[in-house]
Amino acid sequence: MIGKLSLLLVCVAVASGNPAAGKPWHWKSPKPLVDPRIHVNATPRIVGGVEATPHSWPHQAALFIDDMYFCGGSLISSEWVLTAAHCMDGAGFVEVVLGAHNIRQNEASQVSITSTDFFTHENWNSWLLTNDIALIKLPSPVSLNSNIKTVKLPSSDVAVGTTVTPTGWGRPLDSAGGISDVLRQVDVPIMTNDDCDAVYGIVGNGVVCIDSEGGKGTCNGDSGGPLNLNGMTYGITSFGSSAGCEVGYPDAFTRVYYYLDWIEQKTGVTP
């Protein structure tokens, strides 16, 4: 059971050639945070990893939600973006920015698309954080190019111990004033669900966790973004520890493989 669930709303200023251009908006991260049930001995860490090579993750989407919230997403077809339910729950509209690396700059590669057609999983539970998955339908197919590509869905599950790579514009440090200007990535191993559940108590079959004990992980602003491996997305950034991003507690992702039937039913997209 959850001792306490809090939504950390971190205000961050963004000014770029995408939806934030010329507007004094203050973006908030809706990433859910859960109180750990056990103590993890870990030293403070830089959570953001390293800056990604520009456009090396061309399926990565930046989501500007209701002029207020920021999340990530994955382009799984020319018309569909995969993200987290906690990002889209109660939203009115979303600006989907594709082809971006630096979200504070007006990059020629960026394409911005407004959508009001999206939905969360029918059994999304914001208290237990189950079924944390959502889909965004673009109003028309986006043109694919070297900077904007789709990512494949996995045809098999990811094994414990496998090194995977989450990506996003989330905060690189707990002390950071806002999200990262540039897309970042970090390599981390998959851990067992039993070990992850020992920390949070809410980890079911639809969740996959990464071991952050080595000093790496995701943070606020990474919500909804992909967990990458071999050209496929195995997870959707879901929740982390209320103790902070730098203390070494596991990070949890929605397990994409578990939801393949649901994704196919809604979009027709298959592995």
Curated annotation (Swiss-Prot):
Keywords, comma-separated and alphabetical: Collagen degradation, Disulfide bond, Hydrolase, Protease, Secreted, Serine protease, Signal, Zymogen
Any one of the GO CC terms: extracellular region
Propeptide positions: 16-45
Recorded GO MF terms: serine-type endopeptidase activity
PROSITE patterns referenced in this protein's UniProt entry, alphabetically: TRYPSIN_DOM, TRYPSIN_HIS, TRYPSIN_SER
Membrane spanning residue stretches: none
Protein name in the entry: Chymotrypsin BII
Organism: Penaeus vannamei
